[in-house]
Amino acid sequence: MALLTTDLCDAYADEPGAQLRAMNPMLIGYGGRARFGGPVTTLKLFEDNVRVRELLSAPGDGGVLVVDGGGSMRCALLGDRLAELGRENGWSGAIIYGCVRDSAELAQIDFGVQALNTHPLKSQKKGLGERDVSVTFAGVTIQSGDWLYADEDGVVVASRELTL
């Protein structure tokens, strides 16, 4: 069972060692798994999802892919095929600072997805992007190795794994 973001905020908001950060409420849940979390792998790119496919093709070990897509609203960075690939490879979900597509299909896949919005247009395929770099969006800076927890009430990030 996934930890609830509200419970994590209540338990850890005043603990300096957890470095708990709550994202600004701008992301929308699209995946069939509303509650998800795990260790973060970051990716920074713009309107190009080749690196998203590369990472979701590798074993995820219950992790969360955090994609800083620059907030682009001009194309989608993830759709049903990539979500299914991530699920098959053991990722718990993805946070996309950009758009997704195939929203009806995403809702049927046991994979967490939160993003800014939907867009029907696919992304470019140039293979550009940086992995394991600090990314900042929604009022929070996230690094690979942080822990992310998402549910219907929002997204929180901590410097370490949290328990209740």
Swiss-Prot record:
<feature type="binding site">
    <location>
        <position position="102"/>
    </location>
    <ligand>
        <name>a divalent metal cation</name>
    </ligand>
</feature>
<dbReference type="Pfam" id="PF03737">
    <property type="entry name" value="RraA-like"/>
</dbReference>
<comment type="similarity">
    <text>Belongs to the class II aldolase/RraA-like family.</text>
</comment>
<dbReference type="InterPro" id="IPR005493">
    <property type="entry name" value="RraA/RraA-like"/>
</dbReference>
<dbReference type="GO" id="GO:0008428">
    <property type="term" value="F:ribonuclease inhibitor activity"/>
</dbReference>
<comment type="function">
    <text>Catalyzes the aldol cleavage of 4-hydroxy-4-methyl-2-oxoglutarate (HMG) into 2 molecules of pyruvate. Also contains a secondary oxaloacetate (OAA) decarboxylase activity due to the common pyruvate enolate transition state formed following C-C bond cleavage in the retro-aldol and decarboxylation reactions.</text>
</comment>
<protein>
    <recommendedName>
        <fullName>Putative 4-hydroxy-4-methyl-2-oxoglutarate aldolase</fullName>
        <ecNumber>4.1.3.17</ecNumber>
        <ecNumber>4.1.1.112</ecNumber>
    </recommendedName>
</protein>
<dbReference type="GO" id="GO:0047443">
    <property type="term" value="F:4-hydroxy-4-methyl-2-oxoglutarate aldolase activity"/>
</dbReference>
<dbReference type="GO" id="GO:0008948">
    <property type="term" value="F:oxaloacetate decarboxylase activity"/>
</dbReference>
<dbReference type="InterPro" id="IPR010203">
    <property type="entry name" value="RraA"/>
</dbReference>
<feature type="binding site">
    <location>
        <begin position="79"/>
        <end position="82"/>
    </location>
    <ligand>
        <name>substrate</name>
    </ligand>
</feature>
<keyword id="KW-0479">Metal-binding</keyword>
<dbReference type="InterPro" id="IPR036704">
    <property type="entry name" value="RraA/RraA-like_sf"/>
</dbReference>
<comment type="subunit">
    <text>Homotrimer.</text>
</comment>
<dbReference type="GO" id="GO:0051252">
    <property type="term" value="P:regulation of RNA metabolic process"/>
</dbReference>
<dbReference type="GO" id="GO:0046872">
    <property type="term" value="F:metal ion binding"/>
</dbReference>
<keyword id="KW-0456">Lyase</keyword>
<feature type="binding site">
    <location>
        <position position="101"/>
    </location>
    <ligand>
        <name>substrate</name>
    </ligand>
</feature>
